Amino acid sequence: MPELPEVETSRRGIEPYLVGQTILYAVVRNARLRWPVSDEILALSDQPVLSVQRRAKYLLIELKTGWIIVHLGMSGSLRILPEETEAEKHDHVDLVISNGKILRYTDPRRFGAWLWAKDLETSNVLAHLGPEPLSDEFTAEYLFEKSRNKRTVVKQWLMDNKVVVGVGNIYASESLFTAGILPERAAGSLTETEITQLVATIKAVLLHSIEQGGTTLRDFLQSDGKPGYFAQELQVYGRAGELCRRCGNVIEIAKHGQRSTFFCRHCQH
């Protein structure tokens, strides 16, 4: 599933082609995604694009009359292509742009979403979200206070969007490894020093992944069709049974909240 770095990579890739241009109309070949494509998107006509933003794993395209909210789901990707590019089987939505390009949404598993909001304050999917991990609001003081008396294992807790947004399965495993914290520990057991290290590590891991264009494990592509390269630097995620690059012990796997967690018991405590 595309996580925060992949969504931010997509945002940065499509922004120069959209802002200042006009969306002439939308082509929707299959409206049956996770939720049906909003009627307002089906009816788009000559809408100037004011900005392209991100909140958590949602892309936010600001138009004069409202916002397109895009979630990439499990397998979605966005590409900028010449308008005449023929659609293939899993190409479900195109936004036709005034510069002769299209923004094409491809999603083999159709678990993404294209929604509409008159303003972001009224959007149900954006309500109750925690702070952005790369923002000044996400501090050690904030996370330490949130963690007190929490018995949930720290890996699962970090993936709660009410605590912090965008730290999905890959980056939770990688951040906990880099911070030296066992993912099976209760969130409330972490010391202030460990929380400080964890916050710094989450920010560093996410920033580095964005610099590498995200992580391509299955379907994610950047807006230019190229893969993300952070997968080549993964320390534990997806490496169960392989040797830890730091200590040489075997990487283990466990299930937390029905998600696979990867860790090194020697390097993490």
UniProtKB/Swiss-Prot annotation:
DNA binds at residues 90, 109, 150. It comes from the Bacteria. It holds the Pfam family zf-FPG_IleRS. CDD domains: EcFpg-like_N (cd08966). It catalyses: Hydrolysis of DNA containing ring-opened 7-methylguanine residues, releasing 2,6-diamino-4-hydroxy-5-(N-methyl)formamidopyrimidine; 2'-deoxyribonucleotide-(2'-deoxyribose 5'-phosphate)-2'-deoxyribonucleotide-DNA = a 3'-end 2'-deoxyribonucleotide-(2,3-dehydro-2,3-deoxyribose 5'-phosphate)-DNA + a 5'-end 5'-phospho-2'-deoxyribonucleoside-DNA + H(+). GO terms for biological process: base-excision repair. This is Formamidopyrimidine-DNA glycosylase. It comes from Yersinia enterocolitica serotype O:8 / biotype 1B (strain NCTC 13174 / 8081). The gene is mutM.
